[in-house]
């Protein structure tokens, strides 16, 4: 089907690098296909990239602040008590949804890409517009029903949970929790705002991030979930990750041109600062390790010490290019981060801070190109042991094989096709 020129409104969670870059890459692909695309975000530290990509934008108020984002991250990582409320008042939710509705009324889109901008889960159903979300495969109900969802290591607070309770039991627990009313306590103000607009409440995460069409920027070989087993309304595209249009700093080239093992480290925008500091301190202690680190937004690079001839840290780097230069990568397991490394064919040591990140790393473990260290087990000896093992030729060989398969896909092109066809098919 050849679409007429469609207008798409793009929303994303502008503080979350993974969600934001997936939205941005998809919007760029939408424009390249001849469609119209415009961004509407409630603030976010990454929003400057929208104009740099040549896409129209309108910032909406009230904004979701950085301080609110930090609390949301702690909720997602189980760093705070389960049931901790989202740090957004009923009034703010209503005002954010009203701002969405005003923007949508002015733009008159044919469809809305909602990302993880949660006010869209109020405004878009109220406006009765077609809504597309793009989420990790762990948020597909089938993934949970098939008991593939492992307990987050951050919930395993003691020896019994970590070492004694069998994995299959923990997966059954997570199934019951996630498909029940697990988010009810966290979503009180959100549901009060939905009630204000005449919408029913949402009590779990899978329903919270579900669109009329939900795209999984993933592949069965990575997630472990067959395409034919997906819940109705969920479809795979293929990996989507940022290829930042940034130059490689000369410092990176200088560090990686030294003799020794080249290591790239990044814990994305959701890793713990203290964990990143421990990793870098451990790596610096080994003279033949050459280390490049992208800190993103979790800390100031200066907190890791001065740059030297074998260590360089900065906030952002073109990760797809730096990964290609590295012998191994130490990562947090965010979907885009993992997929970038798979595209580059670089063996991975992964440390997941959320269940989704654990699942992403485990996908590469199954393919023989990664080792995962549970967050509770991160220590200098464990890190060094993993580096020794991941440097074996079998991991390199497997990583190259995965690279070939990933590069044969085009997740952006497929997502754009799915989105446009969804809107056109629902017009008929």
Give names to the regions the model predicted:
Residues 105, 206-208, 256, 322-323:
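Solvent-exposed alpha-helices and their adjacent loops that cap or buttress functional pockets
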């Amino acid at each position: 089907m050849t679409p007429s020129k469609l207008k798409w409104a793009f929303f994303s969670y502008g503080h979350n690098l993974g969600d934001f870059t997936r939205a941005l890459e998809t919007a760029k692909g939408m424009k390249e296909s001849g469609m119209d695309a415009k961004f509407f975000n409630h603030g976010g530290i990454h929003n400057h990239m929208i104009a740099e990509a040549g896409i129209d934008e309108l910032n909406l108020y009230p904004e979701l602040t950085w301080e609110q984002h930090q609390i949301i991250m702690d909720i997602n990582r189980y760093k705070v008590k389960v049931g901790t409320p989202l740090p957004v008042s009923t009034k703010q939710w209503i005002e954010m949804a009203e701002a969405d509705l005003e923007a949508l009324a002015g733009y008159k889109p044919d469809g809305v890409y909602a990302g993880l901008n949660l006010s869209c889960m109020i405004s878009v159903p109220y406006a009765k517009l077609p809504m597309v979300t793009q989420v990790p495969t762990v948020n597909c109900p089938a993934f949970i029903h098939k008991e593939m969802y492992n307990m987050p290591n951050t919930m395993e607070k003691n020896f019994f949970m970590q070492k004694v309770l069998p994995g299959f039991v923990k997966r059954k627990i997570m199934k019951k929790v996630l498909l029940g009313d697990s988010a009810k306590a966290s979503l009180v103000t959100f549901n009060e705002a939905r009630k204000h607009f005449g919408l029913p409440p949402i009590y779990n995460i899978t329903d919270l991030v579900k669109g009329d069409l939900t795209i999984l920027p993933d592949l069965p070989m990575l997630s472990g979930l067959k395409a034919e087993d997906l819940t109705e309304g969920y479809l795979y595209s293929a990996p989507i990750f940022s290829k930042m249009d940034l130059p490689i700093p000369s410092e990176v080239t200088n560090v990686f041109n030294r003799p020794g093992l080249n290591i790239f480290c990044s814990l994305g925008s959701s890793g713990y600062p203290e964990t990143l500091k421990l990793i870098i301190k451990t790596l610096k202690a080994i003279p033949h390790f050459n280390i490049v680190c992208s800190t993103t937004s979790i800390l100031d690079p200066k907190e890791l010490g001065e740059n030297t001839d074998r260590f360089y840290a900065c906030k952002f780097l073109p990760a797809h290019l730096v990964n290609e230069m590295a012998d191994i990568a130490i990562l947090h397991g965010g979907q885009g981060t993992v997929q970038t490394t798979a595209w580059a064919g670089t063996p991975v040591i992964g440390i997941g801070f959320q269940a989704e990140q654990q699942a992403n790393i485990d996908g590469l473990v199954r393919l023989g190109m990664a080792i995962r260290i549970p967050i509770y087990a991160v220590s200098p000896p464990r890190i060094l042991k993993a580096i020794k093992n991941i440097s074996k030729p079998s991991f390199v060989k497997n990583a190259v094989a995965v690279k070939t398969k990933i590069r044969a896909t085009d997740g952006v092109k497929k997502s754009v096709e799915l989105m446009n066809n969804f809107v056109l098919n629902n017009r008929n």
